[in-house]
Amino acid sequence: MVQEFNVLRCFSCQTFQVQQVKKAKKWTCKVCGEKQSLIKEFGRGAAADCRRHVQKLNALRGEQHQLNTQQLLAQGDEENENEDVYEVLDPKSEQEEAHVSRWSKYTDQTTEGPNEEKDDEDEDENVYTERPQFRIQGTRKRKKMSSLEPFGGNCDNYEESRAGYSQFRKQAYLPLQLEKRSSSSWNKGSVSKYSNCQRPDDVVPSARTKLPSSRQTVGHYPTACSSSTNTMENSIGNKQQIKSSYRPPTADVNKHLPIQSESPSVSSHQKFGESTIENKDSKWNKFLTIVPTQDKEEYYYESQNGKKTLIPYFTKADTVVDFEERRCPADEKDSGILNRQKVVGGNASCPTTRLPTKSVGFENAVCKPVLVKAPYSSLSLNPLFCTDEDFDDTS
């Protein structure tokens, strides 16, 4: 029996080929190797006849493929030539089409003419868009509107009225402020230490203030336990008044007391600028004598046993302050301090309290007996007073 062959075509590579006839309906392409089913036969017969037929079919397919490629190339060349010619002939038309806005189809070109476009261009040339000019113009307009709205007049009148109103308020406020300052400073009853720095109008009420007189301040002396409630200047003024008005009492014994000073110094009145004011109402003036040499500042005493040793001395400024601090208690005032002193062993002493050594110098000057040349005593020097007579205050 003779073997049969058939001519088939691959669906992927489109080539014709010879395949042996089989019972199965599946075959595989010898060129691309794609497995596919049998759909169409282009010939059946002997092997030699099938090969000649396949060669003819493939040759025809190749020629047709070349024609198709040539046609495609020819069409591409013609299109390129046409484009080049179009660009050379109409370059202006393309530029105009490119410059045309896409919004032109939505606008009415019939209403707009060439004259209107020229007018718009002229207006655009005269417009300035600088920011500083716009800011200045806007602020000026706003200021004018804000100034004209409240009063409805000119801007100058408004500013003048504002200036006058502000001056009136300042003038009305100044007297109130001065009254507050003056009332706060003078109601305290004391002159402030900053009174020299105030205005001349504020210093005027100082003449109306009532300051304590010298007689009122002399009535009470500061003690060690008393506390000062006044200001600094009042306390200094009271001390100066006490120093100037009070003079320590001296007994008749001072007539016989020789007071010597090797180096006389400036008196305390000249040193501190005080004035001597005597209390004429005192009942002790008839028993006291003022020695002109009491203005000497320092006192000293020399012993007579050949040793020149200095006994504690005092100053007149110290006697004024220390006298009240070192005196006897208040219950001994009725009969007088001098009445309570007694001579014990040639020295006077206070019966109730013993005075410290600092008060010795003070009472030595006040109640010192007549100094007699005698050997130096080992006893401490205490205030001495020779008489036991009581002073009658009623006389």
UniProtKB/Swiss-Prot annotation:
Residues 90-100 have a biased composition (Basic and acidic residues). GO terms for cellular component: nucleoplasm; nucleus. InterPro entries: MRNIP, MRNIP_N. It comes from Danio rerio (Zebrafish). Residues 183-195 have a biased composition (Low complexity). This is MRN complex-interacting protein. Disulfide bonds: none annotated. A motif (Nuclear localization signal (NLS)) lies at residues 142-145.
